[in-house]
Each structure stands twice: as C-alpha cells, then as structure tokens.
C-alpha cells in the first residue's frame, strides 16, 4: 500500500488517506497483502537522483518498509521456485 501513512518525527503515524484500504482490496482480490509504504518525499528525491531510499535513508520508515516488502517478496518467490523445481521447462536448441 503505497503512501499508506505519514511517519511523523516523533515516531507516530498519521493516516492521511485513511487506513486499511490496501489490505481490504488485497483480501477482496484474494492476493497477499505485502506491506504499507509510508508517504515520504525522500522516496521521490532518491528515485529522481538514482539513489533509492533504502540506500540514502535506510533507517527511515519508508526505507525500512520497502526493505521489508522486498524481503517478503523474495522469500515468497524463493518458496514458489522451490515448490516448482520439478516443473522445469526444457531448453531446446534449434539448429
């Protein structure tokens, strides 16, 4: 859920656009909810500069959230690949 909330300097969160919409939508679509990414201008600044926030501000709320989402997706892909390792598509060379 991108722009899920605004992380305030005191560590609290402000739900600018409400709360739970992404989770509700994921549940209705029958897909996993993978996380909430807070609204942070540094995400855009870093993206424009070519330096992702996970590099420029790794301990920020957005940096931590994006890293957690990436780790969750990587774990799910790893498990899916392991479970489907017998379903290898053979590569055939055509001469």
Task: Give the ranges of each region predicted by the language model.
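C-terminal lobe/tail of nucleotide-utilizing enzymes
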Residues: 1-95
């Amino acid at each position: 859920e991108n722009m899920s909330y605004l992380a305030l300097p005191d560590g609290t969160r402000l739900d600018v656009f409400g709360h739970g919409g992404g989770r509700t939508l994921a549940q209705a679509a029958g897909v996993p909810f993978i996380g909430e990414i807070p609204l942070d201008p540094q995400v855009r600044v870093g993206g424009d500069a070519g330096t992702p926030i996970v590099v420029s501000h790794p301990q920020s709320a957005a940096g931590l959230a994006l890293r957690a989402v990436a780790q969750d997706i990587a774990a799910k892909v790893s498990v899916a690949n392991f479970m489907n390792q017998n379903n290898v598509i053979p590569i055939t060379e055509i001469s």
